[in-house]
C-alpha cells in the first residue's frame, strides 16, 4: 500500500518551514520506507529527520506502527528537528568522550534550547584542549554514518546487567516510573518501555556504542551537518548539590553550517552583552558572597535605573486604575496551606522558620512554635486584602498591585545573575472581576502589558498559551476548559503569533505568557497573565451582586516584568549597557577642554538639574580625550564639550556614543533638546542625525 500525501499549513515558530507534509503509513511498514515514495529530502536543512504521530509524539523513521497511522514529516530546520539532531549529537559526544577518556562514567545528555549537554563522571575536569580532541573524535564518528538503532530491554534486570558499570544509569533504571516527565532525566527513562539506542557501524553491523535512551534519534550520524562544543562546567548529578559532582560539556548543533555560524555570531554578541559583566563594568549591582547565592544588591547607578523603571510603571498603573498595596515578606504556614502552595510548590520555597516557641528553664518546650515561610508569591496576601471587608459588584474589577519581594529556592546550578535569582521583586497584580467582565478585562490587561513593554523599547512579541498538567492541578475539568477557551480567544484576538505550551500551566489555572525578542533575536519570557477560578474558592472570596446574592469573583494573576531584577537584566543586555537617556544613571556629562571652561559647563548642568535631569561635570585631572573615552565606556548618552569658543558664544558641543558630534549649539537650544529627548522617553540613542532632526 502506498503512502498518501497531503500538505497542510502548520502554525509554527519555524521560519524556514511553514508547510509540513502529512502522510499515511500502513501497518507493519517503517515510517522511512513509506516516506520514500514521497520524494522528501534526506540531505540539507530540510532533510526529514523523524516523524510526529497524531498525538504529537516524535518517532524514529525506523518506527513501525502496529496499525495504519498518520504521521507528519519533521524536517531538520524545525524546532522538533533541531531537538532530535541535538540529542543525537549528545550521544556522539558521549561516545567520543568514552573513546578518548576510558573509564569515564555517563550521566545524562538531553537536548536543551539551542544545543545539548552531557554530564560525565571523569577523572579530571575537561580542558579547552580536551574539547578540541573530543570534537575531532566526534567528526570521525559522524563521518562514518553510524546508524541509531532502537532496542527494547526485556526487563529492568536485563538493562541493569548490561549497565552494571554505569552507576548513574543504574539509578535511573531503579527510578523508572518516578521520574518527572518534564525533567532532563526523562530523556533516558520514563513512561513506556525501557530502551537503549545502539550506534551501529554501517559496514560491519557491529555495535560501536550504546546508551540508555527513550529517543527518538536521527537515522544516522550523517544527519548532523554542523555542530560545535561550546564549553565545559561543573555540575551536580540530577542538579542536586548533595549529589556527586560531575563535569558537563555543552554543545550546539544545527541543520547547516550557515545556521551554526549565525548562532555562534549571536553567542559572541551575547557574551559582550552579558548583564553580569556589564553590571560590574558599569557599577550597577553585585552579588556579595556574604549575602549568599542569588541575592543581588543594587549600587547607586543601578538604583537610579531601577527607580526610573519602577516610577514609570507606577505612573502607568495608577492611570490604568490599579490600587497599590503592600504585604510582608513572611507569613504563617497556614496561609500557604490554604492557598495550595505547600502542596504544589513546597520544593520551590525556603525551609520554614520556627517562631514564638516557649521554653522552661531546662530548655523544654512548653508552647510549640509557629512555622513561618518566606513568601514565594504575593497572591495569598492579596486575597486577604480582598477579603478584609465586604465587596460590592460596583468595586469590580478590583486591581491590586504591588512591587512585592518574594523568595524562591532555586538550585545553585540554575541561578544566573539577575535573570534567575533567589530573592527578587515582582511587579505583581491580582485582578478580581465578574465572569461577565472577564474577557474584556483580559483583553485590557494584555493591551496594557504590550503598551508598557513598548515604553521600555521592546516591541517584537509572540504569545504562549500554557495549558493544564493533569498531574499538577486543582479544579474541575469544566473550569479548566472554560478558562483555557477564554484565554485562547483573547490571545488569538491580539493578532500576535500564538504558540501552545501543553501542560505548562501552574496548578491553579492556564496562562498566557508574553515572549519578547531582544536586539540580537533572543527570546525572553516577560509577562504572564494567569486565570484562576480556584483560589477564590479556596479563600471563600465573595462579593455582593446587583441582585443582593453572594457571588465568587474570578481572579487574574498578572506579573508584567516577571521581576524587576530580571527585567533590569534583560534591558541591560538588550541595550548592551547603553540604557535610553531617560533610564541612564548619568544622563549628561560636561567635559571641559580646559579648566577655565568648567564654570560654563557647571552653569549648564545646574539648569539641567533644575529640570530633574541627572547632569554632572567631569572636573578630574584626566585629559579631554580620556574623559570622552571614560564616559563613552560608561554609556553616558549626552556628553557636552566646551572650549573657549563655546564659552564666548554661550554654546556647547554635543558628543554621542556613536562618535558623532554636533558643534556650537546655543545653550538654551541644547537644554531644550536634552529636556525634550528625555521627557519624551525616546529609547534610541541620540546621534548627530537624530538631534539635527529635532533642532
Swiss-Prot record:
| Subcellular locations according to the entry | Cytoplasm
Q: What Gene3D superfamilies does its record include?
A: 3.30.54.20, Anticodon-binding domain (3.40.50.800), Bira Bifunctional Protein, Domain 2 (3.30.930.10), Threonyl-trna Synthetase, Chain A, domain 2 (3.30.980.10)
Q: Which CDD domains match?
A: ThrRS_anticodon, ThrRS_core
The enzyme's E.C. designation: 6.1.1.3
Report the principal subcellular site. cytoplasm
What biological-process GO terms show up in the record? Answer: threonyl-tRNA aminoacylation
Give the CC-aspect GO terms: cytoplasm
Q: Which SUPFAM superfamilies match?
A: Class II aaRS ABD-related, Class II aaRS and biotin synthetases, ThrRS/AlaRS common domain
Q: For binding Zn(2+), which residues are annotated in this chain's numbering?
A: 379, 430, 557
Q: What is the annotated role of this protein in its UniProt record?
A: Catalyzes the attachment of threonine to tRNA(Thr) in a two-step reaction: L-threonine is first activated by ATP to form Thr-AMP and then transferred to the acceptor end of tRNA(Thr). Also edits incorrectly charged L-seryl-tRNA(Thr).
Q: Which NCBIfam families match?
A: thrS
Q: What is this protein called?
A: Threonine--tRNA ligase
